[in-house]
Every structure is written in C-alpha cells, then in structure tokens.
Amino acid sequence: MLKKTRILSCVFLATAYGYSQAVENRVKEELPELVTIYKHLHAHPELSYYEKETAAYLAGELRSLGFAVTEQVGLYNDPEKVSYGLVGVLQNGEGPTVMVRTDLDALPVEEKTGLPYASQAMAVNENGEQVRVMHACGHDVHMTSFLGTARMLAAMKDSWRGTLVMIGQPAEERGAGARAMLADGLFTRFPKPDYVLALHAAATLPAGKIGHRPEYALANVDSVDITIRGAGGHGAWPHTTKDPIVLASQVVLGLQTIVSRQISPLDPAVVTVGSIHGGTKHNVIPDEVHLQLTVRSYKPEVRKHILDSIRQMTLGIAEAAGFPKERSPIVQVDEEEYTPATYNDPELNQRLVETFRAALGAENVVQVEPVMGGEDFGRYSLEGREIPSVIFWLGAVNPALLDEHQQTGTPLPSLHSSQFAPLPEPAIRTGVIAMTSAVLDLMK
C-alpha cells in the first residue's frame, strides 16, 4: 500500500510539473506581447463609470480567443450610468465552472513615475471637473494577467474540462461594479460559477512572489457623512451661538473611543475622520461643519455596532451641548459605496497554495496578514459564502526598491500613490502562471 501511495504521489507531482512547465513555456513566449499590452493599458486609463474603451479592448481580445463575449453587463442604481462590465464564456465540455475576474477602472491621480509609458490622460469626472487619471492601484497589471490567463487556457483546452467565465468589472474603486453586474443577472444570464478567483497587485511584495491569506483578507468599507448643524454668529460673541466647530471637535474625539473602548481588541476595526470642512473667516462662527469618515471592519456584527455607535454618539454629544432637536446632526451612511469584507474560503485557499508552490516554488508563496483595505470582489461569494472564492496578492515591487526600503527606511510608493510603478515583466509572468495554474487545477 505504501509503495502504491508513493507511486500515485509521484504521478501527481509529475502531472503537476508537466502542467507547470507547459504554462511556463507558453508564458515565456507570450510575455513580450503581454508587456506591450500592459504599457498600452497603463498609458490609457479610464475613471470608474467611464471604462468604455478599456472594456472594448478586453472584449476584442477575448473574442479573438474564441470566447462568447457580452458587453455592457451591469445595472447601477443610477439609471443614467452605463455599465461597461463584460463577460466572456469559453465552454470546453463537462466539468466545473470557474470565474476569473479583473477590474477595469483607474483613479483620479496625476502620475509622477516618470516612466516612458506614464499616463498623460485627462478626464471629466462626475462633478464636471478636469482631472488627471492613472492606474495607481494595479488594475493594469490585473487586466494584463487576466488576458494572459485567457490566452493560456484557450491554447491549452486539451488540459482542462468545464466552463471558463472571465469577467471585466467596472467601478471597483467606487464599490459599485460587482453589485451592478450581479443585479444584471451575472449568475443567471451566464453560467453560475463553482469557484471565483481574482488577484490584486501588492505594493509591499517583490515582483515574482504570491501572497495568500485564508479567511478574512480585506475589510468592510463604509463611508459616513456627518453634518453638524449649529447657529453661527460673530466670533467675538460665541455665547450667542451654537458653535458647530467646537461640537465637531468633540465628536471627532468621541469617535476615537468606539474602537478602543467598545470593540474587542481581537476584532480589527478602524474609524477615521478623513475630512473636516467648516467656516469661511477668522471671526465668523459658521452654521454647519461637515465631517467625512471611513469605517473599516470584518465581522457584520462589528460593522453594525460601529455604525450604530457613530450615530448615537454624535446625536448624544449634540444633545448634551444643548443643541436643539431641530438642529440635530445628520448622520448618513453611503450604502451605494459600501463594500463588504472579502473572505477567502480556507479550503480553496489551501488548495491554491499547493498549486502555486508547484508552479512557482515554495519560496515564492508567502502567507500575508489581512488588511483593512476594501475590495468589492467579496460580493461574488453571495450571502452565506455560497460560492468558494479566493483573491490572492501579486507581488509588484521592484526587489531593488524593496531592499533599499529595508536597509534605509526609504518609503515605498503605496497603492493609490502617484509614484506606484509595478515591475511589469516578473509581475505579469507570475500573475499569468499563478492564475492559469489555479484554473487548470480546478478544472483538471
């Protein structure tokens, strides 16, 4: 029996090695063209809700590979917005259905990398303002890895069986794209997946490495707007006013106690006041002050507790300060841009870890800590985590910069930074090998 087990193990490893070698050889051939695609996408970013040309580019690539492609998939809450979501389906006999997702949108950031293919793009945002646009969150790397994976799998149809669904999702940066595509029948108009996969560029991992995290990987994200309504007047007669600036200051300090005193130290959470606006002149007490908050959590019950406490604390401080009820603060939670936490299915995560180790080497696959950033990828698991899903981190940093950072403390450009510049060749190579190997393992 022991001898038979060893033989089967050797057969499995040989098969895995064969797949890995075939994928690696194909990626090596395709890499120069994929890097060219990456530079094109990097130089031509589009804002959330305006990804028309980006989506068309990806749709054309998928069609050329034999995918049945549907464009403009998605229904936003605002009926005037057009969704540029796209779905490509490649059927290859009986077997599981695997969905691979990339995001399409870029950010209103002026690029300062100095790269020869740096973005010079300008766009008009929703407020009618001219803004610079940059792929500062790695979505260009995501899309290139996505297209590379599509090429690999279309060329290796003799190595897998099932249905491959590849989706280009708009408006990830606004937390709206996944919800829009699901609302438009992503899992009813198209094959419902048995597994859902995605990757995300990492600004702290060297290019060539993969980071994985079982269970919670990214956080719930809520945006909260608070309007403190007072009664303004002359700064020399504050006793005749209800000063919203003083009250706003008390609210900001009070909010800091929610996480430190109401939430268990074992439950990660963040309440950050990112913006305070009020007043116009030195000696004028304004009528209103506006606060903008970001709230991060993992567990649903922790999220609810924090949001309830923000409302209760803000109203309570105003009441204690003698503000009249008709001028009570207004606390609004933006449900439109709420992003649920991303939970990586532990069993699927471990299966992929073994696949990544076989394809890339164990030294290039590392477990990372969960982060308080957000991603609407978590919506694809559906309620109750019905569909196993995993998003993994793709190292994107030039190893030389990482060494310099570790030796001298020189800051690394973070995601959303104007200086964020992935190292294309090793990042794309690793992304394509990892994602292709993952799909092959699930559909073998």
Residue ranges and their predicted role:
Residues 3-10:
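Sec-dependent signal peptide recognition
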Residues 11-20, 30:
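Hydrophobic h-region of N-terminal signal peptides that target proteins for export
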Residues 21-135, 140, 144-148, 152-162:
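Acidic/His- and Gly-rich active-site-bordering loop/insert found
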Residues 28-32, 45-56, 140, 144, ...:
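Soluble non-cytosolic domains of exported or imported proteins
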Residues 41, 88, 100, 139, ...:
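Divalent metal-coordination and catalytic microenvironments
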Residues 85-87, 122-134, 140-141, 152-275, ...:
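Histidine/acidic-residue-rich, glycine-tolerant segments that coordinate divalent metal ions
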Residues 246-444:
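Metal-dependent amide/peptide-bond hydrolase catalytic core
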